[in-house]
Amino acid sequence: MKIQQLIVFLFAVVLIDARTPKRYSELDIVMSTCTTFIGKYGTVCTSTGKRSTNWNCYCKTDAGFGTISDCLVRGFNNNTNIISKFTESCNMTESKFHAKYDKIQAEFKTNGTEYAKMTTKSSSGSKTSASASKSSKSTGSSNASKSSTNAHGSNSSTSSTSSSSSKSGKGNSGTSTTETITTPLLIDYKKFTPYKDAYQMSNNNFNLSINYGSGLLGYWAGILAIAIFANMIKKMFPSLTNYLSGSISNLFRKHLFLPATFRKKKAQEFSIGVYGFFDGLIPTRLETIIVVIFVVLTGLFSALHIHHVKDNPQYATKNAELGHLIADRTGILGTFLIPLLILFGGRNNFLQWLTGWDFATFIMYHRWISRVDVLLIIVHAITFSVSDKATGKYNTRMKRDFMIWGTVSTICGGFILFQAMLFFRRKCYEVFFLIHIVLVVFFVVGGYYHLESQGYGDFMWAAIAVWAFDRVVRLGRIFFFGARKATVSIKGDDTLKIEVPKPKYWKSVAGGHAFIHFLKPTLFLQSHPFTFTTTESNDKIVLYAKIKNGITSNIAKYLSPLPGNTATIRVLVEGPYGEPSSAGRNCKNVVFVAGGNGIPGIYSECVDLAKKSKNQSIKLIWIIRHWKSLSWFTEELEYLKKTNVQSTIYVTQPQDCSGLECFEHDVSFEKKSDEKDSVESSQYSLISNIKQGLSHVEFIEGRPDISTQVEQEVKQADGAIGFVTCGHPAMVDELRFAVTQNLNVSKHRVEYHEQLQTWA
């Protein structure tokens, strides 16, 4: 499946790069400034379209060239770089430009207004145009100036055509003529500076927005590149990491790479407020730093190089000006992030294989990028509304289709931000998931129709492509696996056991997981991830699921009244996903620690390593509450006899012997006594028989001291040691903390690998 994943990734990259957004060159900004300023006084060259320049007119006609060249020379202080770029666009030499310009200036000085229209502005703000009688003079006149082309910058700065041209308001304060002027229009450029500053700010803001958007993608590309490099090194040279066990390495690992952000809680949610409404998950310290830097960069990039231009002719108020600039910036930044957040949220993400990150890590980053992106879009919508209100364009603009779709996308994004809170995901994941998909569809479609006319539609196509390919690959996995008849039963009162015949080509991944669709009328649209093991004959996968709310509860209710609490249900399987931890490759000693229903994935990885290993020390520790929990994992525990795995099971509530009747039908644990014992003695007898049947397993009653256990294991290790865990979040966090506190106990490297997939 890695080929399909690579196609998804590369196709997205190609789409993003297919048509980059419009960037404004220095000449674009100059021409935009000049043509707008000239347009206040008259029409010299007609427009050929939005944000386009009538090059034919400005390069080849006397009126167009004479007017625009005067703006370049006097308005932009004869900037040689600008003039050079203009001449390239007009396919002329710089010497020809200067000669032609000097000729026009000489004609004007010699013949006054017979050659050019001279614009002035009265004190009342109305514009007057002094025009000479139609003369036969032309640019080819023999009276053209023969002066040096390098002198006209200073010569024309005090041209007699200059007028007082004071600006009495924002925008087009004069009333421009509608007819096209056929002779050069020479204008006073004393009040030109606000135009230069304003158009430099507004047009360059688009360029900076694209640069900063690329910078945000570059930031994540850098993070991914580091992760890919580290992962490739670990895979190609697995023993190399064992040398990274010195004080400096351990210092970074103890305080940066391994620990939770705040003391212990990483897998456990933190609580704010009442009823768990503001509960959330905090990633590791390193992941938090990565996210914080991203958030800070986004905030900086949203505001850098945005400021108020005094006497800005484009906007009537400061609020309108700054609102428009911030809206453009945040909108473009948000657009750049959309394909990335879709990619990070997909199950068939090729980057998982390259980086070695698990799905939970990508989902965590997906959520944070999504939060930042939606906030950018909300700021974009608010600031544009403020700007449009200030300029009086709001009501008209909101009737346009692209604005309606933009509003739809923004509203859906806001609902996604609210609806994706941990509170809703945990309370009813199925409802959350269905609503989430619907909202995302409208968010992306609305975003496309909003952005397509602005030149940014390709970003949405990239997002759609990533999403669509992910769905196609997922459907392909399901199709080739087929609809299989699974045997589903309730074990130990709180666990579902799902046995699914698998195709021969389907390779089980140690420590992996698969998504299951139950083909029941109200359940088939839902899919849930479960870790699995395989039978000894390798013809089935066996999945275990703790009965909670939602789909597992519905299945349990369906099975409860049936004989043996068992039924055959057709299922669709999507997978496998995940991979074993690197502890088996890197460490001479591996300790697998599972809690409750976290055992299947840990067990499969442990047994897989035992089959391949010859001289590694492998230990399996399983922490359960009650004896009855053993009932649904009996076959797997018995198989451990054939391996070199040292197994220990902690029973934290051994006095609770309820549910042991499920062992009575197991031949391995039949009572050895013929006495008619009391219920209590029968239970203890059965427990004794369980221990005898699993004599290769050490049973310890009580809760383990994880910190002490880790310290002992590290001290006893004769080489690098790795801890691999999955189970209750509190236990997992406790083990993580214990490992970070014992990195320096031994001279050997100590590793920690977490297989708990927390994404709901």
UniProtKB/Swiss-Prot annotation:
Cofactor: FAD; heme
UniProt feature coiled coil, ranges: none
Gene3D superfamilies: Nucleotide-binding domain of ferredoxin-NADP reductase (FNR) module
Entry's transmembrane regions: 213-233, 289-309, 325-345, 372-392, 404-424, 431-451
Topology Cytoplasmic: residue spans: 234-288, 346-371, 425-430
Region described as Disordered: spans on this chain: 119-177
Residues bound to NADP(+): 575-578, 726-727
Glycosylation positions in this chain: 78, 91, 111, 143, 155, 207, 615, 744
Topology term for the membrane: Multi-pass membrane protein
Intracellular or extracellular location(s): Cell membrane
Extracellular side: 19-212, 310-324, 393-403, 452-760
Induction comment from the UniProt entry of this chain: Transcription is negatively regulated by SFU1, copper, amphotericin B, and caspofungin; and induced by ciclopirox olamine.
CDD domains listed in its UniProt record: NOX_Duox_like_FAD_NADP (cd06186)
PANTHER family for this protein: FERRIC REDUCTASE TRANSMEMBRANE COMPONENT 3-RELATED, FERRIC/CUPRIC REDUCTASE TRANSMEMBRANE COMPONENT
Function comment: Ferric reductase responsible for reducing extracellular iron and copper prior to import. Catalyzes the reductive uptake of Fe(3+)-salts and Fe(3+) bound to catecholate or hydroxamate siderophores. Fe(3+) is reduced to Fe(2+), which then dissociates from the siderophore and can be imported by the high-affinity Fe(2+) transport complex in the plasma membrane. Also participates in Cu(2+) reduction and Cu(+) uptake. Involved in maintenance of cell wall integrity (CWI), mitochondrial function, and interaction between the pathogen and the host.
Protein name in UniProt: Ferric/cupric reductase transmembrane component 1
Naturally occurring in which organism (per UniProt): Candida albicans (strain SC5314 / ATCC MYA-2876) (Yeast)
Highest classification ranks of the organism: Eukaryota, Fungi, Dikarya, Ascomycota, Saccharomycotina
